[in-house]
C-alpha cells in the first residue's frame, strides 16, 4: 500500500509540473476500512420545506466530526427555479441523478427535500435521525491524490489514484463539495430568508478506471469556490450503485 501511494503521489506531481499555479501541493488519502454511509440530500433554495433538511444535514455533519465513513452530499436541483428564485447551486445533472435514484430504488417519487442513504430513500431523518450506521468492512481499497490548480482565471482540481485490486464490476465516482455557503434569498417561497448550506455538491461525475486500476481527472470548478471550505469525495460502487468504499480529501490551500 505504501508503494502504491508513492506512485500515485508521483503521478499527480508529474501532471502538475508546468501546467498552472498550485494553490497547494498534492494531498493523499487511502479509502477507509468501513463501508461508507453515503447520504444524498436533494434540496432547493426555491422550496420552503427544504431549510429544515439543510439544517439537519449541517447538524449531522457537525455531530459526525471527522468520521471517514460518513459521506454527506447535498445536491441542489433545478426544477423549482421557475417559481421565483433560481438556486445558484442547482444543476440539471443533479435533477437527473435524483430521478435515476428514485427509479432504481423504488422510491415513491421525486420531491424536495428527499434523502437517500446508500442509494435507498430514507424518510427517518424527519424524526431527528436516519439510518447512518456503518454497513460492515469495505471489500475494496484504493489510494487517491489531488491538488487545487489555478491560473488566475479558472479553478480546477487534479485527481489521480489507483485501485489496489481492479475489477470489471467496480465503478468510481467523485464529488467536490463546499461547506459554509450562504444565500440571501430575494424571491420565491423563501423570500427574505438567509439560507446556510454545507456539503453542497459543486462538481461530480464518473472516474474512468483503466485495466491497471489507475484513474485520473482534471475537474473544472466554479471560480468563486472557497478552497478552505471544500473537500473531495471518491466513492467506489458495485454495478448496482451500492457503495463499497470511499476516501475523502481535504487539501491545504
Predicted regions and their residues:
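Bacterial N-terminal signal peptides that target proteins for export
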Residues: 1-9
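Active-site-proximal cofactor/substrate-binding loop regions of enzyme domains
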Residues: 2, 22-111
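Intrinsically disordered and other compositionally biased segments
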Residues: 8, 22-23, 115
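Short loop/turn motifs at secondary-structure junctions
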Residues: 8-12, 111
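N-terminal signal peptide c-region/cleavage motif recognized by signal peptidases
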Residues: 18-20
